[in-house]
């Protein structure tokens, strides 16, 4: 029975390793595709400045929340 447990553990470790490796590979491919596409868009944007930013736009700044500090100054 000990051999069956170690074999099951070995299979689980191998499967988890394969899944982790495939996820890492997918992440690398997506990042590479995103960077290469943004580089192509950057080179195209020099000739056409009105082009869209594409699927990987730069991070926009967070929207400004209305500040309630000093709002009493606006009231009469």
Curated annotation (Swiss-Prot):
Record's compositionally biased regions (Pro residues): 52-65
Q: Which UniProt keywords apply?
A: Secreted, Signal
GO MF, any single term:
hormone activity
The record's subcellular locations are:
Secreted
What does the entry give for GO biological process?
positive regulation of Notch signaling pathway
Where does the signal peptide begin and end?
A: 1-33
What does the entry list under GO cellular component?
A: extracellular region; plasma membrane
Q: Where is this region: Disordered?
A: 41-76
Q: What does this protein do?
A: Involved in the regulation of glucose homeostasis and lipid metabolism.
Q: What is this protein called?
A: Adropin
Which organism does this record belong to? Answer: Bos taurus
Q: Which gene encodes it?
A: ENHO
